[in-house]
């Protein structure tokens, strides 16, 4: 779908409101029923005509009357048989629908479990970094950091051991702005992408969008220009934005986009460009996971520059450099901008820290990315110096505090407020408790939502942060609304995207759903589900393969008779103990394991998929599987050390990262084996390891079946 200059006008015909679609479906169903009833009436009336004509010929004799009535009587419909057939068809349909729904839920559970397990790993890794930073600070006080700084990782971490940029550090900020100035970058003559000039206007933004549609890359000079201009606007805004719909009489809220540029185009095409009478709120997580994160970011920031009173951006948990290292945004920048990605990355860290953290609509609706906790207070959010939190994953350090106790108390309270509003999730249970599934933030129940809304005089809490199958979902007695705008989030056809429009003085919600895919209309629900299910099972098998050795040991312990098989129930208990993914393993067993002919046992010895790294044969299985299991963490470590975004790390950096990974996983890795693996990955033997080659070197292979 296009979203060029002409798409600024709203198109009411494309407003796919949920209520309208439901009414249309009901009307269509009633019309079909009336049509069937008319056919039945016509059939019965024609039968009556035949009966009357045949009876007029039966007055000649009683015998002929009886015989003719039996011969000429048309077969009358049998209501009982018709009803039974209809009931049987309904049962078949409902069973089929129930099976599809069960498969969909199991698939969804796999995707979410793997996603949240990755987020847990990321937060654990950052906790580990925090411990290292603390140790560095202690060593620094003793004057013994020289050895630590020789380590590539220690050198990278030294940047994060310093406090975040503050207004009082004017020279530091000034130098950063000078180093990232667009005037430092020249435009090559061969550049054929979109061009921009200040002041920006909607036609320029429209041309930029059209260029992005055909995969043209915006020149880094223009990227830096947009970031600098957007930074000025965000810096002047309060931590909590407040907007009024008295003029527009409506407001549109969009959830996570995660680099899905096609979804952003659909939103602008269906709903029009932001304007005074068509304001927008984009509720965080603009980047990561999708392949066009920088394009999404440039369009949103450009729209803010054009009309800052018509579009409001809230910060999400992925507007964070540490998250970007793991989930793809830094990799995307390195691929598209090579060496020039370094100043862009440095400036983005600062710009993200200036994004507002929440928005209030007419003192009635509270909009925040993640959610709330029992400690969340708007008055505290208003006063938070948000720019101190370049990463929300750790509390900032302020050297200006008089005592360490005062420093800890003040910063931790502010940090907890920030962490909760960006990482929390609603639950049906009452109360508030730590969000252990994600590893950060809180779970909050309906009572917490009700208390927060009543305390602040709000009617509704709108948040994002969670992928929903339909693109949105109400919870907590319709007082908490989740909106997620990235369609096909896990896989093509996995979910719809949606946005919500609050219209009128009563601000009634109207939902617009969509799916940015050209193929989903041509395939059936069963076919789409099959594709998504296949993708989920493939990822789950890869995850299980990374636990192969641990699983086999556990299976052998439980297999007292050494038969090479286990009952499905025992097998599922073993898998859950080792992986901790909290999945319906009994239902998933036929898809991820080999079963006996009667389907009662899992033949665990026939699991032949093992992890392999590089081409070396002298491998220690425990080391290889540990590296494979934590390959995302290893990639994060590499990108953390790759300060110049060259995409390469030295052998020393590789060995250092693996040793750090061993400390992080509390399973020390032997240097000899790490060196063998490193040599096998260094295909051109230049002493450097390319990150892309490293990730390609991780693979699953089928081992020979032992007889």
From Swiss-Prot:
Keywords: Calcium, Cell membrane, Cell projection, Hydrolase, Lipoprotein, Manganese, Membrane, Metal-binding, Myristate, Palmitate, Repeat. Residues 59-73 have a biased composition (Basic residues). Its main location: membrane. Ca(2+) 1 binds at residues 642, 644, 646, 648, 653. Binds 2 manganese ions per subunit. Residues 81-103 form the IQ domain. This is Serine/threonine-protein phosphatase with EF-hands pef-1.
